[in-house]
């Protein structure tokens, strides 16, 4: 998916519609 411009070292993405995969990068669901 597309990058969300957010990292998720805690395993949580705060950007709506994004998931922490592959860690530690948030990508669009």
Curated annotation (Swiss-Prot):
Gene Ontology BP term (one): defense response
PTM statement from Swiss-Prot or TrEMBL: This is a cyclic peptide.
InterPro entries named among the record's database cross-references: Cyclotide, Cyclotide_sf
Signal peptide: none
Ranges in coiled-coil conformation: none
Domain of life: Eukaryota
Cyclopeptide (Gly-Asn) cross-link, renumbered residues: 1-29
Keywords: Disulfide bond, Knottin, Plant defense
S-S bonds: 4-18, 8-20, 13-26
Entry comment describing in which tissues the protein is expressed: Expressed in leaf, fruit, pedical and stem but not in root (at protein level).
Comment text on domains: The presence of a 'disulfide through disulfide knot' structurally defines this protein as a knottin.
Family: Belongs to the cyclotide family. Moebius subfamily.
UniProt function note: Probably participates in a plant defense mechanism.
Protein name per UniProt: Chassatide C1
Taxonomic lineage of the native organism: Eukaryota, Viridiplantae, Streptophyta, Embryophyta, Tracheophyta
